[in-house]
Amino acid sequence: MRTFVLRARAAPTNSRALLEGVGNEAHTEILAHTLMNTMFVAQSHRQDVVVHLVLESTKDFSRTITIHSNEVSNVGGFHEANLLNIVVRALDASTGMGKEELRNVEPGVTVRTISFERLVQQLAENHQLYMLEKKGEFVRDIKFAANPCFLLTDHIPMPKKTFNSLKRLGTQNISLGPKMLFASQCVTLIQNELDLQE
């Protein structure tokens, strides 16, 4: 199983604000682009991929929307608007949730009121964590673990305190090259490296 976590620090947990953020300061389109490039290939979709989108611009709790590629069925078409609608439906389903609650949204999609830090702690129990870092080990020099989990962020960098927490969880820093890339570009390169190692 390949797992990806996108920490979307600027993404609102209000569905209307999320849609208004497309192409604006929040850059919520990154959610759709990352979903597209983690879960789909030409004329098909990838098996055994899990994507966690952690939306953090909120008045109450972060929302973690989880999509399982093997189970998701209600995409409705391969374009940005339909992929964002998955996120919108999950946010609407999360209205009124308390801390660390879980709701099923539709086949293959759940929403939880759980923070990035708590999610990563849970994932570290049965995944090898990899964090993209410019000074990390070059991706081509790494033999990936059997159950990898890749941690990415939107255009707002991770807080410095997060790096210490991730280090304690055994996170390995990896680099995709000298240029800073969009999260949606990173996942394409990571998927390709994993494909080559299979």
Curated annotation (Swiss-Prot):
Domain of life according to the entry: Bacteria
Enzyme class at the top of the EC tree: transferase
Keyword Cytoplasm among record annotations: yes
GO molecular function: S-adenosylmethionine-dependent methyltransferase activity; tRNA methyltransferase activity
Keyword hit for Transferase: yes
InterPro entries to which the protein is assigned, alphabetical: Alpha/beta_knot_MTases, TrmY, tRNA_m1G_MTases_N
Source species of the chain: Vibrio vulnificus (strain CMCP6)
UniProt entry keywords in alphabetical sequence: Cytoplasm, Methyltransferase, S-adenosyl-L-methionine, Transferase
Matching Pfam families: Methyltrn_RNA_2
Protein name: Putative pseudouridine methyltransferase
